[in-house]
Design a protein with these regions (language model features):
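A short mixed-secondary-structure module that forms the rim of ligand-binding clefts
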Residues: 96-127
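HotDog/MaoC-like acyl-thioester-processing domains
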Residues: 27-59, 148-149, 159-198
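Short structured motifs
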Residues: 77-83, 137-144, 170
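Catalytic strand-loop segment that frames the active site of acyl-thioester-processing enzymes
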Residues: 78-108
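Hydrophobic beta-strand-centered segment that forms part of the acyl-chain substrate-binding groove
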Residues: 123-159
Length: 198
């Protein structure tokens, strides 16, 4: 409780009625303790998210993370994904345009982008679910809006906090090219259900 009132004091300092009793250094130290407590309290339970948070601080770490994902699900290796951002509610993954993912007209192949969409949706689902739940893709609706003539980035969002019982969950994904033009729009349907009791 005292920590909360100290935080309130930081927020209100300089405003009428603010409590200026504590020196600013004490308030900063108090705030850092609060931040640590908040982080601990809401620490991710997903092993995948913990691994990302540990490895994402460096280029090598992000490369190792992508390799690990490719090892767990080998088909994703075919697009050589580069993870940009990963957390509950958001996953952003980049695909570099190169010969191996091009079609006969020199643009990024439709199925490579579908693969990218499924990867982004699967990863955001994985890190957003509580440990008591599991998921598997059940379907995909995809629209190819423009030819992709450059690297592309997929963004999957899953704005959900409550999970209970078996359900189908649609995960929207957008893919943009290097100029920000949307080239693909997809919804990946995930079947989410409780893990069996062990």
């Amino acid at each position: 409780m005292q920590r909360c009132s100290a935080l309130k004091c930081v927020a209100l300092r300089g405003f009428p009625g603010a409590s200026p009793e504590l020196p600013i250094s004490d308030l900063i130290a108090e705030r850092q303790q609060l931040d640590w407590l908040t982080i601990t309290k809401t620490a991710p339970t997903s092993p995948v998210l913990r691994r990302w948070q540990k490895l994402s601080k460096s280029t090598l770490g992000r490369w190792l993370f992508a390799r690990g994902v490719g090892r767990a699900a080998p088909y994703f290796k075919t697009i050589t994904p580069r993870f940009v951002e990963l957390g509950p509610a958001l996953c952003r993954v980049r695909l570099r345009k190169r010969r191996a993912v091009e079609n006969h007209i020199g643009t990024v192949h439709a199925i490579a982008m579908a693969n990218l969409c499924e990867l982004a949706a699967g990863m955001v689902t994985e890190v957003s679910l509580p440990p008591s739940m599991r998921w598997i893709p059940r379907g995909m609706t995809i629209e190819y809006l423009q030819p992709a003539r450059s690297d592309v980035t997929a963004t999957a969002r899953l704005d959900r906090n409550e999970w209970s019982g078996a359900q189908n969950v649609g995960v929207p994904v957008t893919v943009v090219d290097s100029t920000g033009v949307e080239v693909v729009r997809a919804v990946i349907t995930m079947y989410v259900s409780p893990r069996p009791q062990q």
